[in-house]
UniProtKB/Swiss-Prot annotation:
Source organism phylogeny: Eukaryota, Viridiplantae, Streptophyta, Embryophyta, Tracheophyta
Gene Ontology process terms (BP): translation
One term under GO cellular component: chloroplast
Family: Belongs to the bacterial ribosomal protein bL32 family.
Localisation per UniProt entry: Plastid, Chloroplast
Keyword Glycosyltransferase: no
One MF term in the entry's GO annotations: structural constituent of ribosome
Protein's UniProt keywords contain Plastid: yes
Keywords: Chloroplast, Plastid, Ribonucleoprotein, Ribosomal protein
Protein name (Swiss-Prot/TrEMBL): Large ribosomal subunit protein bL32c
Length: 54
């Protein structure tokens, strides 16, 4: 069974965790931005009837 030779440092662990968190934040911000543009009718990435509001 493969075993790591040395322990991962706390700073490296923190950096990796922050990268993982920032990816989630970016995805959430993008989703929120898209929802905002859909609700105002300014979306350029969706085709279809613009008068149909949910």
């Amino acid at each position: 069974m493969a075993v790591p030779k040395k322990r991962t440092s706390i700073s490296k662990k923190r950096i990796r965790k922050n990268i993982w968190k920032s990816k989630g934040r970016r995805a959430a911000l993008k989703a929120f931005s898209l929802a905002k543009s859909l609700s105002t009718g300014n979306s350029k990435s969706f085709w279809g009837d613009k008068s149909n509001k949910y």
